[in-house]
């Protein structure tokens, strides 16, 4: 959340392929935004793609990648999930929304969403739980998590256990935004 395609520039520049798409998940022109609307926009965006996708997602992007792979198994060649949750911790969302309510409206401008839209969007994810559907993901999966990303480390380890085909990489001295802390690591994994 709060990232743009520009935040992935350092990773993308190191990739051995040129056909890379970093979709913007939020649009300031949309009045109402929800998790399902973002997922629907991605499904529409990739509906005509013939070749299976190699999807890399961080945080919300990882959650969307998991959901997309469950819903469109035939369209996904592999997943790289960074700082991933597969079951949204409702207490964390509630705490996050409490913090959001205390923040000034100006703090949300860089995301392209208003404060109220951000709170509604976060609330729309409150009940997401893909635990029972993870066995539908059959493609290779790489799970990455920064050692300092304490909010997602446990879930990343559990995800590795729930997906037998998954490999787990804990990146030392890195926090949540691995595209900023360890772009070389992500690029190396995506290039293999």
Question: Where are the model-predicted features located?
Answer:
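Conserved alpha/beta-hydrolase "nucleophile elbow" surrounding the catalytic nucleophile
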Residues: 1, 57-62
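Active-site loop/oxyanion-hole signature of alpha/beta-hydrolase fold enzymes
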Residues: 2, 9-13, 19-54
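Short beta-strand immediately N-terminal to the catalytic nucleophile in serine-hydrolase-like folds
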Residues: 55-57, 82
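Flexible "cap/lid" loop of the alpha/beta hydrolase fold
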Residues: 63-66, 70-71, 78-105
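Hydrophobic, aromatic-rich cap/lid helix
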Residues: 106-130, 148
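Short beta-strand/loop motif that positions the catalytic acidic residue
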Residues: 136-137, 143-145
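Conserved alpha/beta-hydrolase "acid-adjacent" motif
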Residues: 150-155
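Catalytic histidine-centered segment of alpha/beta-hydrolase-like enzymes
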Residues: 174-184
């Amino acid at each position: 959340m709060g990232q743009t395609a520009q935040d992935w520039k350092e990773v993308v520049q190191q990739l051995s392929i040129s056909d890379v798409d970093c979709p913007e998940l939020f649009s300031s022109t949309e009045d109402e935004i929800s998790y399902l609307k973002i997922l629907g926009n991605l499904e529409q965006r990739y509906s005509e793609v013939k070749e299976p996708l190699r999807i890399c997602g961080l945080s919300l992007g990882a959650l969307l990648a998991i959901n997309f792979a469950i819903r469109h198994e035939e369209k996904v060649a592999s997943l790289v999930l960074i700082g991933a949750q597969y079951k949204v911790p409702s207490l964390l969302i509630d705490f996050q929304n409490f913090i959001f309510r205390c923040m000034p409206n100006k703090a949300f401008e860089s995301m392209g969403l208003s404060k109220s839209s951000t709170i509604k969007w976060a609330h729309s994810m409150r009940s997401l739980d893909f635990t029972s559907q993870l066995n539908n993901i059959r493609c290779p999966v790489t799970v990455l998590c920064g050692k300092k990303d304490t909010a997602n480390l446990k879930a990343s380890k559990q995800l590795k256990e729930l997906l037998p085909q998954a490999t787990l990489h804990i990146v030392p001295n890195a926090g949540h935004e691995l595209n900023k802390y360890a772009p070389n690591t992500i690029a190396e994994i995506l290039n293999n």
